[in-house]
């Protein structure tokens, strides 16, 4: 009976245009479908002051103020400098190159890497017509030259696109006296960095191999 009542309530919710639009939007989030979206919306409606209003305000503030840094690709607030590349209290000599923000967060949570990140914003791919002009490749080279970087660690995924991108970056850095390395083999073929467990990630970093003559 309770289940039937909830289903009836959910059907009524869908007849309200604002609710219907919310269901469509929330259903697009990772791991959420229409049923989960409806439960979330019901929770929000039942907690307007405690959840719905502050969530709406926080989303609005994030939309206005959170952007990608044009220099390194990391997320930053428009109200402050980029914590990844413009924080003067942090002085590192390594840059870890990743495809996206999720990869950066995964590596940060493992605590294996102490250095700067450079987030490309994707990979070179013929499938989605993404070209080098679409990625932060030129700014990577500029960062290497300006920041006394000793090593660039390529932490792209073990996909065809990820490896193609890594090779392109390696080739772009060949005339700079710097060590270029990549995560150790052992990453599952086709595997994406954000899906790796800490143990696999730590091993891949510790056993990374040099790719050029500047390597140890």
Model-derived features: where do they sit?
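Cys/His-rich Zn2+-binding cysteine-cluster or related metal-binding knuckle/ribbon modules and their
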Residues: 14-19, 38-96, 100-104
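Conserved phosphate/pyrophosphate-binding and hydrolysis machinery centered on Walker-type P-loop NTPases
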Residues: 30, 49, 62, 75, ...
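Signal for well-folded cores of large energy- and translation-related assemblies
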Residues: 27, 45, 60, 73, ...
């Amino acid at each position: 009976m309770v289940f039937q009542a909830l289903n009836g309530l959910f059907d009524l919710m869908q007849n309200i245009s604002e609710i219907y639009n919310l269901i469509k939007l929330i259903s697009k989030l990772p791991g959420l479908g229409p049923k989960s979206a409806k439960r979330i919306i019901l929770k929000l409606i039942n907690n307007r002051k405690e959840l719905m209003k502050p969530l709406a305000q926080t989303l609005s503030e994030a939309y206005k103020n959170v952007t990608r840094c044009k220099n390194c690709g990391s997320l930053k607030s428009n109200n402050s400098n980029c914590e990844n590349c413009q924080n003067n209290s942090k002085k590192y000599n390594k840059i870890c190159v990743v495809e996206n923000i999720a990869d950066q967060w995964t590596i940060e949570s493992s605590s294996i890497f102490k250095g700067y990140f450079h987030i490309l914003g994707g990979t070179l791919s013929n499938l989605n017509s993404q070209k080098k002009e679409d990625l932060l490749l030129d700014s990577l080279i500029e960062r290497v030259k300006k920041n006394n970087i000793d090593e660039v660690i390529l932490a792209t995924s073990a996909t065809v696109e990820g490896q193609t991108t890594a090779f392109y970056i390696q080739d772009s850095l060949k005339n700079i006296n710097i060590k270029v390395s990549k995560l150790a083999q052992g990453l599952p073929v086709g595997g994406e960095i954000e899906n790796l467990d800490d143990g696999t990630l730590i091993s891949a970093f510790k056993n990374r191999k040099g790719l050029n003559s500047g390597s140890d």
